[in-house]
Amino acid sequence: MGKYRVIAGQNLYDIALHIYGSIEGIVDLMMCNTDLSLDTTLKVGDELIYSDEFIINADVVAYNEMHGIVPSNGEHHVYPKVFTKPLAVAFALPTQILSVQCSVSGVGTLEIDWGDNSDTEVITLTDKPQLLKHIFDNKVRKRRRIRWFTDAYFKQVDWSGLQPTSVVILRPLPIEELTIKDATLTLDSLQMVTGIYSLNLSGLTSGNLKPLVECRELMTLNLTDARIKPTVLDDWLIAMVERYGNRRNCEVTLTAVPTGTYQEPARNADTGHYNITSGMEAIWVITHEESWNEGGKWKFIINDKEYSV
């Protein structure tokens, strides 16, 4: 007699096809395992006894062995998933990812569609961050998608473990502290995040930081080890001066360095306005404009060197 160990996603028919080359092999499985029935729910690691010299279709068995195929179809949803909250965020992930995780805290309810055959996961948010882990039960040919349905208020959110290639926020989303580390992303959707005062984008790869200009409530911005061109930093910093408006003072941490010299820029002879030509000049203006530093001082930390007044 042989022993067969069940793997993820397998049902009784998968195992019969793998061992005997035909689903008719379930008869032998139930004869060898008297407590087994068509209603039995198999779990990963379960062991089944089978007649090791009994094969119904040798060609199928040989083909599976030759191509390394292990039947694993599992159970699939027949009916659409139902959600009670509005669609708030859509993520796109690389196809090769097998498992993900994220953490959340706040007030309200979050419904997650993991984009596979699993049921909707419903999370009641609490003040303490909850680590959510998921192993995908299917394969996809194109990008994998995850959807969040919620109208909750989030205190802390960490999307780093999702490894997203795209984040699309579809409605105003209140988040106090957001972390997305080591991601390659466009940041346009961050304009839909409200009430955010701490943003950790360390390790970010992006070709445009201008969407950050609209994050006016930020008090902490971490861009450590971000792979960003100096000219991209320049465009963001200059745009922030030009569209400063009503915003909080912020502590910005960088390892990439903007162009230029930290000095007062020249003024336009006609208007008297600064003619800013580099990112470092923009930082000088931000840190030296008195009205922008009344409630608290702006601080830029670039490779451990502090620029402030």
Language model region names:
Residues 1-111, 118-203, 207-224, 235, ...:
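Cell-surface/extracellular proteins and modules involved
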Residues 226, 242-243:
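C-terminal low-complexity, glycine/proline- and small-hydrophobic-enriched intrinsically disordered tails
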Residues 228-237, 266, 274:
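Leucine-rich repeat
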Residues 248-309:
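Membrane-proximal C-terminal cap and juxtamembrane stalk of leucine-rich repeat ectodomains
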